[in-house]
Swiss-Prot record:
EC number: 4.6.1.18
Summary of the function given for this chain in its UniProt record: Endonuclease that catalyzes the cleavage of RNA on the 3' side of pyrimidine nucleotides. Acts on single-stranded and double-stranded RNA.
Quaternary context: Monomer. Interacts with and forms tight 1:1 complexes with RNH1. Dimerization of two such complexes may occur. Interaction with RNH1 inhibits this protein.
Family per similarity comment: Belongs to the pancreatic ribonuclease family.
Catalytic activity: an [RNA] containing cytidine + H2O = an [RNA]-3'-cytidine-3'-phosphate + a 5'-hydroxy-ribonucleotide-3'-[RNA]; an [RNA] containing uridine + H2O = an [RNA]-3'-uridine-3'-phosphate + a 5'-hydroxy-ribonucleotide-3'-[RNA]
Keyword field contains DNA damage: no
GO molecular function: lyase activity; nucleic acid binding; ribonuclease A activity
Span of the signal peptide: 1-25
Protein name: Ribonuclease pancreatic
Length: 149
């Protein structure tokens, strides 16, 4: 009887798995923002090879070299709180961008001019600057790094 019940439930399980599984491999916009821009510890951000290591580690050198990226070295909660700070217009003209009320510790990574894929070579520069992020969702969280000021 237990086997019979299992055989009846198996097709339902397969159907459910097929419905849920595709979303398992998909990264949300908020998760992508965190992968590409958050490094709260930032322990080796003062190293000249920081950007080379982090860009590779965070999958931004697969297939091509991402030309520019910024890492934020602040707690995630502090960066998420920017979504309730000063509303500003995004570079693309949308109205869902917000500017941090204070300067944050960031590292800018710029692809060096002579660098070619697959040997992505970045210049690492540290700053204390305000940042602008685009926010979406419920809860309202950063999904795009728009600029520094």
């Amino acid at each position: 009887m237990g086997l019979e019940k299992s055989l009846m439930l198996f097709p339902l399980f397969v159907l459910l798995l097929g419905w849920v599984q595709p979303s398992l491999g998909r990264e949300s916009s908020a998760q992508k923002f965190q992968r590409q821009h958050m490094d709260p510890a930032g322990s080796s951000s003062n190293s000249p090879t920081y950007c080379n290591q982090m860009m590779k580690r965070r999958d931004m050198t697969k297939g091509s070299c991402k030309p520019v990226n910024t890492f934020v070295h602040e707690p995630l909660a502090d960066v998420q709180a920017i979504c309730s700070q000063e509303n500003v217009t995004c570079k693309n003209g949308k109205s869902n961008c917000y500017k941090s009320s204070s300067a944050l510790h960031i590292t800018d990574c710029h692809l060096k001019g002579n660098s070619k894929y697959p040997n992505c070579d970045y210049k690492t520069s540290q700053y204390q600057k305000q940042i602008i992020v685009a926010c979406e969702g419920n809860p309202y969280v950063p999904v795009h790094f728009d600029a520094t000021v």
